[in-house]
Amino acid sequence: LAELRAHPGKYSFGSPGVGSLGHLNLAAMNADLKVDVLHVPYRGMGPALTAAVGGEVQVQQDQYASAQSLIKAGKLRAIAVSAPGRLAGMPELPTLAELGYPQLNALGQTWFGLVAPTGTPDAVVQTLKQAVGRALADPALVQRLATLGAQPEGGTPQAFAQRISQTLAANRKIIETAGIKLDE
């Protein structure tokens, strides 16, 4: 942090594009940590990772599943993870929360969920929920997901809807505070 603060604008952060999760996390990091790291948007994560490996950008955030081979090959250096806990595949990496940045830890978490069209009958939603619950109870599936850096949670449709709403509100605040325009 001292280096970033001593040289505002010297370091750059590659993201898969304007308005992406990586872009929003950089904006939050700049504001929360009082640093000025330049955002360099690419056309997708592949080009952004290539830029990080090639030294075009000094900071990169990506999902463990797509970056792990580059990390293990020594082409990228992992610093921390933004996850509820340490990842099974790289238990030596601390979380951002462990490093003292809990506000950034929550923002950087990528999550996936199952959605259905509005108006889907409750019986269908419950059938899907139960099927997902059974799948997530399979130790082999949980182990496979862990190798990809995923930490399955399960839950209720209501809890997932609330998580979506909270994430949208947090992202909206970052976009407004940073003045991000999606047509940049």
Predicted regions and their residues:
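Short helix-initiation/N-cap motifs at beta->coil->alpha
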Residues: 17, 40-50, 54, 63-66, ...
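Alpha-to-beta junction loops
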Residues: 7-11, 35, 53-62, 75-78, ...
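A ligand-binding cleft/hinge motif common to bilobed small-molecule-binding domains
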Residues: 28-32, 59-93
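Periplasmic-binding protein-like
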Residues: 82-118
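Hydrophobic residues within well-ordered alpha-helices
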Residues: 26, 52-53, 71-74, 128
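Hinge/capping helix and adjacent helix->loop/strand transition within the periplasmic-binding protein
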Residues: 1-47, 59, 96-98, 111-144, ...
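An extracytoplasmic/periplasmic, membrane-proximal ligand-sensing/linker region
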Residues: 33-35, 72-73, 122-184
